[in-house]
Amino acid sequence: MSGVEFCTKYQGEEIHVTGLDFDPTHPAIVNFSNMVCEGYTERTRTQYEDMIERGCIPNITWEELVSYCPKTPFYCIDHIVYALDILGVCSFADQDKIRIAYRQCDPSKLHFVRPSADDTIKAIRDAGGVAVIAHPHEALFDKGIVKDYIAKGANGIEINHSELTERAEKLACHAAIEYNLYCSGGTDHTGAMSACGGAYAIPVYHGVTEDEYRAIKERRFG
């Protein structure tokens, strides 16, 4: 089953949307993914080079840094941490100080705007996929954001995830029943398929039942 995850911005919240079982060659998802990957990579490079300018890390060029990373369509802070560990600049165990410095980049230098919920969901659905509201924490239910995303075309929801509280999981399950949503699970960067190729994967897995998987494959809810 094909899969991809995007980060959208809505009402001050960052909401992740996962696309499942889509046609990975469809122009809608290819063009959208390329646009997002290019934007994220440029943003990551800007934040990385800003850390160098502020003296937070040694002057290692961007090109040298990424040469130590697994080849990927885009680069994020996880890849910076991964490469700096290999280069002996900062151990993976001490990565918090790198992540803090990364977030302190001058906002005026950052021009990439996270994709909208509408554009993200449309790209996934146009490619024949299921648009899943990923790891919806309690605030997304309390603020009505989950309902808004469903109204925008989201037709799936993660009901099992390491970041979800017991209440959030119950709310997700109830939403799945009420709105006939496909159910999925996820581990993000904690599983063997993490952004760094599993090099620092935490063995935690949160999936779904075989029936829930087949429901997606068979498009039982349309």
Regions found by a protein language model. Give the residues of each.
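Extended substrate/RNA-proximal surfaces in nucleic-acid metabolism proteins
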Residues: M1-G144, E212
